[in-house]
């Protein structure tokens, strides 16, 4: 298992945030900037509006994304961690490409559960110029993602599609002639609404901002039900994704998913073995105190993956 305890070397968010640069890019951030107990500029990460404006400033300053917003009560993602997943996935593609990350529109990625924030397609396109298809079961989330894509003139790079069957993840989503180098997925973490609420309250307490009058804490602990939990939790979702991926074994080079709970790995590895995959990779990722990992699998052996890369190069 490869160890990646800190941010990926290519991650743009190394070290402390440069608040003067962020405020210059998005002046509205100034009214949310505070001084933390260490005397450094920061924001109140328990304030959802502050987090939203902070993300907007980060995307403007670091990625040139001029327009970004999400509806209230939708997941507001921590961008450095989301960027790490993109870079770790890029390393996966480089593995069969002589160590070089493939870039450009010839590389196509599928973001399963793109969400209202559309964050993975934005980061993946900005860093590597990949083309994306983002799927979701939530029409409100897709409408928000579409507004972001259109406002930034990215319609040729990022397409969106609704998964009309809420019981399926991949099933019925892709056309027979579509090919994807990569799939991405940040699955629902919890197994029930109650578990999601308890998890949010723990994070709220850790921030020292517990408020008994609130029904649910805010911040990037917010989110719609389908963003936070599903029946059976993370292990059931990822295991279902593994099972459904078999149907698209020829059409996708690498399937990947984040897995937050290390205790879920044995069950997921059993599902991968049952599916008969040809290759598996597990890469540990860490941002601050949060640990996660990317699980990747392919139904193509090494020579088949190299042949896929050669075909892609010939189309450039």
UniProtKB/Swiss-Prot annotation:
Transferase recorded as keyword = yes
Listed SUPFAM superfamilies: S-adenosyl-L-methionine-dependent methyltransferases
Report the catalytic activity: adenosine(1618) in 23S rRNA + S-adenosyl-L-methionine = N(6)-methyladenosine(1618) in 23S rRNA + S-adenosyl-L-homocysteine + H(+)
Q: What is its main location?
A: cytoplasm
GO biological process, any: rRNA base methylation
Q: What is its EC number?
A: 2.1.1.181
Q: Which GO terms describe its cellular component?
A: cytoplasm
User: Where does this one sit in the cell?
Assistant: Cytoplasm
Q: Does the keyword field hold Cytoplasm?
A: yes
Output one GO MF annotation: 23S rRNA (adenine(1618)-N(6))-methyltransferase activity
Ordered alphabetically, the record's keywords are: Cytoplasm, Methyltransferase, rRNA processing, S-adenosyl-L-methionine, Transferase
Q: Which InterPro entries match?
A: METTL16/RlmF, rRNA_lsu_MeTfrase_F, SAM-dependent_MTases_sf
Annotated Pfam families: Methyltransf_10
The record's listing under PANTHER family reads: RNA N6-ADENOSINE-METHYLTRANSFERASE METTL16, SAM-DEPENDENT METHYLTRANSFERASE
HAMAP family attached here?
Answer: 23SrRNA_methyltr_F
What is the recorded function of this protein according to its Swiss-Prot or TrEMBL entry?
A: Specifically methylates the adenine in position 1618 of 23S rRNA.
Which family would the database say this protein is a member of? Belongs to the methyltransferase superfamily. METTL16/RlmF family.
Instruction: Please state what the protein is called.
Output: Ribosomal RNA large subunit methyltransferase F
Give the classification, highest ranks.
Answer: Bacteria, Pseudomonadati, Pseudomonadota, Gammaproteobacteria, Pseudomonadales
Report the gene name: rlmF
């Amino acid at each position: 298992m490869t160890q990646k305890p800190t941010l990926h070397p290519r991650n743009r968010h190394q070290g402390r945030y440069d608040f003067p640069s962020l405020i210059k890019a998005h002046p509205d951030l100034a009214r949310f900037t505070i001084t933390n107990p260490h005397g450094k500029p920061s924001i109140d990460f328990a304030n959802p509006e502050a987090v939203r404006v902070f993300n907007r400033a980060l995307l403007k300053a670091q990625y040139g994304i001029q327009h970004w917003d999400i509806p209230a009560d939708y997941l507001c993602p921590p961008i450095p961690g989301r960027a790490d997943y993109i870079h770790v996935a890029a390393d996966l593609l480089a593995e069969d490409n002589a160590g070089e990350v493939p870039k450009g529109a010839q590389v196509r990625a599928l973001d399963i559960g793109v969400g209202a924030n559309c964050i993975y397609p934005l980061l993946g396109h900005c860093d590597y110029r990949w083309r994306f298809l983002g799927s979701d079961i939530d029409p409100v989330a897709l409408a928000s993602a579409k507004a972001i894509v259109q406002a930034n003139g990215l319609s040729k790079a990022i397409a969106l599609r609704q998964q009309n069957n809420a019981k399926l993840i991949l099933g019925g989503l892709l056309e027979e002639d579509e090919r994807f180098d990569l799939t991405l997925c940040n699955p629902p973490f919890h197994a029930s609404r109650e578990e999601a609420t308890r998890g949010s309250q723990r994070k709220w307490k850790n921030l020292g901002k517990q408020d008994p009058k609130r029904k649910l804490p805010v911040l990037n602990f917010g989110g719609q039900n389908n963003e936070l939990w599903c029946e059976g939790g993370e292990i059931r979702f990822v295991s279902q994704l593994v099972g459904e991926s078999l149907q698209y074994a020829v059409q996708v080079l690498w399937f990947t998913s984040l897995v937050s709970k290390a205790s879920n790995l044995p069950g997921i590895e059993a599902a991968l073995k049952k599916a008969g995959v040809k290759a598996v990779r597990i890469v540990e990722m860490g941002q601050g105190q949060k640990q996660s990992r990317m699980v990747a699998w392919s139904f193509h052996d090494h020579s088949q993956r190299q042949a896929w890369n050669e075909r892609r190069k010939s189309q450039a």
